[in-house]
């Protein structure tokens, strides 16, 4: 998700 580095970054 967006802004979620722990879940994928972009």
UniProtKB/Swiss-Prot annotation:
Q: Which organism is the protein's source?
A: Oncorhynchus mykiss
How does the record describe its quaternary structure?
Component of the cytochrome c oxidase (complex IV, CIV), a multisubunit enzyme composed of 14 subunits. The complex is composed of a catalytic core of 3 subunits MT-CO1, MT-CO2 and MT-CO3, encoded in the mitochondrial DNA, and 11 supernumerary subunits COX4I, COX5A, COX5B, COX6A, COX6B, COX6C, COX7A, COX7B, COX7C, COX8 and NDUFA4, which are encoded in the nuclear genome.
Which pathway is recorded for this entry? Energy metabolism; oxidative phosphorylation
Which keywords does this chain's UniProt record carry? Membrane, Mitochondrion, Mitochondrion inner membrane
Transmembrane region(s): none
Using the UniProt record, give the first listed, main subcellular location: mitochondrion
Protein name, entry field: Cytochrome c oxidase subunit 6C
Question: Where found, per UniProt?
Answer: Mitochondrion inner membrane
GO terms for cellular component: mitochondrial inner membrane
- Write down the membrane topology: Single-pass membrane protein
Role:
Component of the cytochrome c oxidase, the last enzyme in the mitochondrial electron transport chain which drives oxidative phosphorylation. The respiratory chain contains 3 multisubunit complexes succinate dehydrogenase (complex II, CII), ubiquinol-cytochrome c oxidoreductase (cytochrome b-c1 complex, complex III, CIII) and cytochrome c oxidase (complex IV, CIV), that cooperate to transfer electrons derived from NADH and succinate to molecular oxygen, creating an electrochemical gradient over the inner membrane that drives transmembrane transport and the ATP synthase.
Is this entry keyworded Membrane? yes
The biological process GO terms on file are: oxidative phosphorylation
Taxonomically, which superkingdom?
A: Eukaryota
What family is reported?
Belongs to the cytochrome c oxidase subunit 6c family.
